Regions:
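Short, helix-capping/interhelical loops that line the mouth of catalytic, cofactor-
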Residues: 1-12, 61-111, 160-169, 285-286
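N-terminal regions that are enriched for targeting/export leaders
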Residues: 2-33
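Short glycine/proline-rich turn/loop motifs
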Residues: 4-5, 87-95, 118, 127-129, ...
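Short, contiguous alpha-helical
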Residues: 14, 34-85, 118, 125, ...
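Intrinsic, low-complexity polybasic segments
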Residues: 118-123, 167-182, 186-187
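Functional-site microenvironments in short loops/helix caps that host divalent-cation chemistry
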Residues: 139, 143-145, 149, 155-169, ...
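Short proline/glycine-enriched turn/loop segments at secondary-structure junctions
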Residues: 410-414, 440-447
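Short, structured beta-strand segments at or near domain termini in extracellular proteins/domains
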Residues: 449-458
Length: 458
């Protein structure tokens, strides 16, 4: 994986664009035209639409918005503009075939590389104040997000796992937990316990000197955080299973009012991809295969309501996003009674993610044990705060003080108020996208994404 370049290098950006597109194409290479339409579901897109939308977005922002070129496809906006096309109508569109979609995808990338490749980036800025590199990065990161969406769509639709070239070398310090290699004891290994965070005044958000930030991260602002204790690891399957076995899904006293309404409507009695086997053993569906539940893997595909209900049962709580970012980014003073002014870009420091620090980029083709990868610990000893599994926080997704939408106005503002913030990335997240201050957000009922959580003491 090519990290997001630190400088506005045409060659580096061109290489990142090509690598990102190659990954997108790998994710759908084995799928038929019919599989790339799939059933009409509220939580996924037809993949022929999704892949075409990725190319349309790149064309719109780089070629049309910045360069003021004419559309390649006259009907492109009516097919692929997510702001104009209601989600449930995307299956009814006259979508091109897979082959035609791939030809469009390649044509747009070729045009971008031809115009913005080795001969240099356009240094001038448009009326909105953003230069060409900004829009190339925007399109690239957008493609990274959709590559993750394509992967969880394959999980949702019971497709086989994608065949990813980078996954062929599975060393690099990672020790993947093979699907189905369960914790034979049936008991959790000793927990790493809680990290003590002294609290204090902390800068939440991103600073203007970063190469690229999304509008919802702007800008870093001082927040006061009280001392707290946070789990050093994400919650494991072994820790979540007793909540299920104790009837946690059948006790309305453990659920927020809207959470209980969701549980009754969904008929949820356990995580969405769990299934009870004869003899009381749990199985988990990993893409198209049912495997014995792996005790030390993080609990996956649980929504915010499920995480909140577990916390009530366990006498714990979810961290706020400020607490989460402090635990990931801050450094303790020598006496551990306060934090220093330093703020890390990643839990381990400012160096780009490596395979011995974070499970990202499909490298393990799944999650690893929650106590793996100690080289990626934060200054407070919190593990895997980047990669492996997205982590729900207690915080509603909303603007930071002084928020101003970026050119892509539909990215953040329409979702303020009814989504929850997740942090940290998961095993399919690209290394060029994720860092401590990146904010993801989903509606609290979403169980299809690779979402889990860690807890805080009350």
């Amino acid at each position: 994986m090519i990290p997001m370049p630190a400088q506005d290098s045409s060659l580096e950006l061109a290489s990142a664009l090509q690598e990102g597109r190659a990954r997108t194409l790998e994710l759908i290479a084995d799928l038929t035209d019919e599989q790339m339409i799939g059933p009409r579901l509220a939580i996924v897109n037809p993949l022929r639409w999704e892949v075409g939308h990725v190319a349309w977005f790149q064309e719109y922002w780089v070629l049309r918005h910045f360069r003021r070129e004419s559309p390649t496809r006259p009907e492109g906006d009516s097919l692929y503009d997510s702001a104009r096309i209601a989600h449930d109508t995307r299956w009814d569109l006259p979508l091109p075939s897979k082959a035609e979609t791939l030809a469009y995808v390649q044509r747009i990338l070729d045009r971008v590389l031809e115009t913005h490749g080795p001969k240099g980036l356009e240094a001038s800025r448009r009326d909105d104040g953003y230069d060409e590199a900004y829009f190339i990065r925007l399109a690239l990161l957008h493609e990274y997000m959709h590559a993750e969406a394509i992967t969880y769509t394959r999980q949702t639709l019971n497709y086989t796992p994608p065949k990813i070239s980078i996954a062929q070398g599975r060393s690099d310090g990672l020790q993947p937990h093979p699907p189905g290699s369960e914790d034979r004891s049936g008991h959790s290994q000793p927990s790493l316990g809680d990290a003590e965070i002294p609290g204090g005044t902390f800068l939440l958000g991103s600073s203007p000197d970063m190469t690229f930030v999304f509008d919802n991260e702007q800008w870093a602002h001082a927040v006061t955080v009280r001392p707290f204790r946070i789990a050093r690891t994400a919650l494991s399957n072994t820790e979540f299973a007793p909540f299920v076995d104790d009837g946690g899904y059948k006790r309305p006293d453990l659920w927020a009012e809207d959470g209980w309404r969701w549980r009754e409507s969904a008929g949820a009695e356990h995580p969405v991809y769990w299934q009870r086997q004869a003899g009381s053993r749990w199985l988990r569906r990993n893409f198209d295969e049912w495997v014995p539940l792996e005790g030390r893997l993080p609990v996956l595909h649980v929504n915010w309501y499920e995480a909140d209900a577990y916390c009530r049962w366990a006498g714990r709580r979810l961290p706020t996003e400020a607490e989460w970012e402090m635990a990931a980014s801050a450094e303790p003073s020598p006496d551990a009674q306060s934090i220093t002014p330093n703020k890390r870009l990643f839990p381990w420091g400012d160096e780009a993610p490596t395979a011995d620090r974070a499970n990202l980029n499909w490298r393990a083709m799944g999650c690893v044990d929650v106590d793996a990868l100690p080289a990626g610990d934060s200054a407070f000893g919190c593990r895997q705060m980047i990669g492996n599994v997205w982590e729900w926080t207690a915080t509603d997704f909303g603007p930071y003080p002084g928020f101003s939408p970026g050119p892509y106005k539909e990215y953040s503002a329409p979702w303020f108020g009814d989504h929850k913030v997740l942090r940290g990335g998961c095993w399919v997240t690209r290394t060029g996208l994720i860092r401590n201050n990146y904010r993801n957000f989903y509606q609290p009922h979403r169980r299809d994404v690779w979402g889990g959580f860690r807890t805080c003491a009350l």
